[in-house]
């Protein structure tokens, strides 16, 4: 979501004296309230970190679940993650990492009895055998799974290939805590950085004005014991970047992964867990081209994917072009939507984007599965949403598109266009698909829904709600 994240907005500054006294400078009333909550969360997480021992992080061994993969007993962690103030500022999940091989067999042993459960992604329809408190199943070639038992914190399984081959010749972060210079890890060109499992980078990661950079491994980028607001893993004006395998744990307001004016970026098998306001998952901005996401678990408090262009004056108007995401799972809190293009789109064009096989396993507040809220002047065109599956029962919001001025618009407003949008093989319990063009010269047109199911049935032409500044929005079954 863009409303709090434009460069035009101020961030508050936290000064820490002796690790205990905080002075907040230049805050609005809302920011003071949020900061007070963050301070409480930070103090609690810091106290927790002193008792965990193994990773010096807000992670303790889970007593709720055991996980056995191919007869290998995994470490299962109970993680405390950042959350909205109205949810107490924190939430617990249980996590385990595993290395995927074909035909992987999984056994989950729960600490107490249960009746109902959901294993996501549902689209795989994996046969599960339940024997008392045990669940067993064999997984296909997919890497992320979520087990939800009513009334309990979920179990999240994060799989990936073996990355050990990247270690040779790399800058290695061994298991343990590592601190960036002034809280930032600035990565350099022509280097591979390897995160051993159990390695924790305590600070933000900045990949800026560099090329040929790899950050790979099963460690964590984690500021939960010392949260600092702002975007967390940043790829700016860089080319030929690989991000693979690691976990992202941000404990303050800010997008978890953000990219601007970067190209030829490959992101796979990340696991993100941050559930506060403006904790978008995987975000792209102006000038991003040939960026590819795959097999990522996106635990977010705001938009799962947020692709936009927030500041033409600072970032230019190079098109957001030819970017793709596939086989990712979204586990989202009660702000934002599953997939968002917008709302700030201060660039020349946004085009040739594809989202395929995206599973929205949780969307707490019933937000739209897909939204293109267009508040600026870009030509938005040639976008495909294929195999988007919103598993949220009782959701009433499927698709939203509009072209209009709102709080995220550039002060000098110019309307844009939306055209050539395709929805293929999508599923949602919601039926509402709403379209609002701006005027006869700035329309929403040529939108197709093919083999889409809503509310447990085939989508109908009558499900489309559109104003007079739209054209050729069709449903085909």
Question: PLM ranges: what are they?
Answer:
Residues 1-10:
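N-terminal secretory signal peptides that target proteins for export/translocation
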Residues 9-17:
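Sec-dependent signal peptide recognition
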Residues 15, 23-38:
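Bacterial Sec-dependent N-terminal signal peptides
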Residues 34-477:
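Extracellular/periplasmic carbohydrate-active domains that bind, remodel
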